[in-house]
Amino acid sequence: MNLSNLKPAEGSTKTRKRIGRGPGSGLGGTSTRGHKGAKSRSGYSKKIGFEGGQMPLQRRVPKFGFKNINRIEYKAINLETIQKLAEAKKLEKVGVNDFIEAGFISSSQLVKVLGNGTLTAKLSVEAHAFSKSAVAAIEAAGGNVVKL
């Protein structure tokens, strides 16, 4: 056995269907498209979502909800994250710029501090919003809250 005489196993390959190559091929004439009509022509495509005249799904299902144009979206940062950041950088004041430098947020995002985790460091924390539990935990640790 050499590389020059390798062949696929018997029956493992099929010859592809060559349509539209004359009547002698057995697949000429209509080229497997049936007779006439839009579906037999080149360039045919039906509309996306068309169900043959039946009321399409996107029209059968009712509309719901809306996008509130006044919504203010905050990026959540927990107390445990602030604690780790304060320990790593030995900070007394943690602000939005520290979160940006650490890669937690981008410069255009607003920050909300949430109360998950424990805070032992006495910190002054600056953010755009705070949860009640976060404010309580920061003040219990001897720190203070600065709302931007």
UniProtKB/Swiss-Prot annotation:
GO molecular function, one term: rRNA binding
Ranges annotated as biased composition (Gly residues): 21-31
UniProt keyword terms in alphabetical order: Ribonucleoprotein, Ribosomal protein, RNA-binding, rRNA-binding
Top-level taxon in the UniProt lineage: Bacteria
Gene Ontology BP terms: translation
Coiled coil feature spans: none
Annotated region (Disordered), positions in chain: 1-50
Entry GO CC: cytosolic large ribosomal subunit
Function noted in UniProt: Binds to the 23S rRNA.
Family indicated by similarity: Belongs to the universal ribosomal protein uL15 family.
Name of the protein this chain belongs to: Large ribosomal subunit protein uL15
The organism of origin for this protein: Bacteroides fragilis (strain ATCC 25285 / DSM 2151 / CCUG 4856 / JCM 11019 / LMG 10263 / NCTC 9343 / Onslow / VPI 2553 / EN-2)
Gene name of the encoded protein: rplO
